[in-house]
Amino acid sequence: MKHPKRPVIRSTTVIGVLRDGKAALGSDGQMTLGNTVVKHSTRKIRSLYQGRLLAGFAGATADAITLLDRFEEKLEAYNGKLERAAVELARDWRTDKYLRRLEAMLAIVSSERALIISGTGDVIEPEDGIVAIGSGSMYALAAARSLMKHTGLSARDIVRESLETAAEICIYTNNHIVVEEV
């Protein structure tokens, strides 16, 4: 339960795209506290499991880092099996008293899979190979779907263009963009 007077640290757009055997994941760099931008170049993308996976987060930064650490532990325990590690993290997140309070979401991509892990314990694998989380996610998702359908752009370029579109619309998204690829 959120404390009603506690300012919420939020803002972000993270989007991942699978295309032609490659995966790209990118984010903007803005972090806000309440209605104030406190940082423009926050890094929200991490390389995991010997560079085979990329993970991005939206939500409270400390909470997201905690979840990423747990997810890395699960990856090691399950020999890099993305789906199994994601399901086990979601199970823990849903049942553990401490983890249940964490306010974040994760977007994870490999060259073959794209998943969203939510705080409600859901593991979502979109049919179109596009994952998007954060305040500008719907703008970026719409742009990515259109670019996938109507262009031959690479996964990396689709992610970058989608984030640029979100930055033009969403006040919690900026154009300090980081894109990584596996």
Curated annotation (Swiss-Prot):
The record ties this protein, via InterPro entries, to:
ATP-dep_Prtase_HsIV_su, Ntn_hydrolases_N, Proteasome_sua/b, Proteasome_suB-type
Amino-acid positions noted as binding Na(+) in the UniProt annotation, renumbered to this chain: 167, 170, 173
Explain what switches its activity on or off, per the activity regulation comment.
Answer: Allosterically activated by HslU binding.
Question: Which PROSITE patterns does UniProt cross-reference here?
Answer: PROTEASOME_BETA_2 (PS51476)
Task: Give the signal peptide range.
Answer: none
Q: Where in the cell is it found?
A: Cytoplasm
Can you cite a GO biological process for this protein? Answer: proteolysis involved in protein catabolic process
For this protein, the record's Gene3D superfamilies field holds: Glutamine Phosphoribosylpyrophosphate, subunit 1, domain 1
Q: What is its EC number?
A: 3.4.25.2
* Domain of life per record: Bacteria
Catalytic activity annotation: ATP-dependent cleavage of peptide bonds with broad specificity
Listed CDD domains = protease_HslV
GO cellular component, alphabetical, reads: HslUV protease complex; proteasome core complex
Q: What SUPFAM superfamilies would the database entry show?
A: N-terminal nucleophile aminohydrolases (Ntn hydrolases)
Keyword terms of this UniProt record: Allosteric enzyme, Cytoplasm, Hydrolase, Metal-binding, Protease, Sodium, Stress response, Threonine protease
Task: Give the family per the record.
Answer: Belongs to the peptidase T1B family. HslV subfamily.
Query: Quaternary state and partners of this protein?
Result: A double ring-shaped homohexamer of HslV is capped on each side by a ring-shaped HslU homohexamer. The assembly of the HslU/HslV complex is dependent on binding of ATP.
Can you name this protein? ATP-dependent protease subunit HslV
